Design a protein with these regions (language model features):
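Membrane-water interface at transmembrane helix exits
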Residues: 33, 69-73, 97, 101, ...
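Terminal transmembrane helix and immediately flanking juxtamembrane interfaces
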Residues: 10-39, 112-144
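"…centered on the first transmembrane helix and the immediately adjacent amphipathic helix/loop
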Residues: 12-71, 86
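Short, small-residue-biased leader/transition segments that mark boundaries at the very start
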Residues: 1-8
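Internal alpha-helical transmembrane segments of multi-pass membrane proteins
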Residues: 75-88, 144
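Membrane-interfacial alpha-helical segments at the cytosolic side of multi-pass membrane proteins
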Residues: 61-75, 120-133
Length: 144
């Protein structure tokens, strides 16, 4: 049986390859909104613990890269260049978000510890994705 990856390899489907990455794109848009909007979740209304925002940053980028791993594996399996591009892209995006927060006068500020949390989350997302996504696909194949 032909998989989704085979469909996007056809010449007539090449312009639509990005559609296979819609889940990753949606997560990226949500992260961008949360990073650049002025107080998007009214964070002053609740307090968890010191550094909770760093944990949130790490989890967002972990999720972004894990979903990216899922999309890559679903379409074409893992290759080192694709995974390196994914994690480096997420890290660069995290840095860009911090720079934009510093440049925009929206009551937000650039924080290099946020960038560090974004980067750590992206790397952990890659480790988690590479080790869990193939397993999940094998498990799902058993039930189909």
């Amino acid at each position: 049986s032909r998989g989704l990856g085979d469909v996007y390899k056809r010449q007539d489907m090449r312009p639509f390859r990005f559609l296979a990455f819609v889940p990753t794109i949606i997560v990226l848009v949500v992260i961008t909104y949360l990073s650049l909007a002025k107080n998007p979740v009214h964070s002053q209304e609740f307090y968890l613990f010191e550094g909770a925002d760093k944990l949130v940053h790490g989890c967002m980028y972990l999720g972004l890269v894990w979903i990216g791993c899922f999309d890559i594996y679903r379409v074409s399996k893992f290759t080192a260049p694709k995974l390196i591009l994914l994690v480096c892209g997420a890290i660069v995006w995290g840095g860009l978000m911090e720079l934009l927060q510093g440049a925009m006068s929206m009551g937000r500020s650039a924080d290099w510890y946020d960038f560090l949390a974004n980067s750590c989350g992206a790397i952990l997302g890659l480790i988690l994705g590479v080790n869990s996504v193939p397993y999940l696909f094998r498990k799902c194949k058993k039930f189909s």
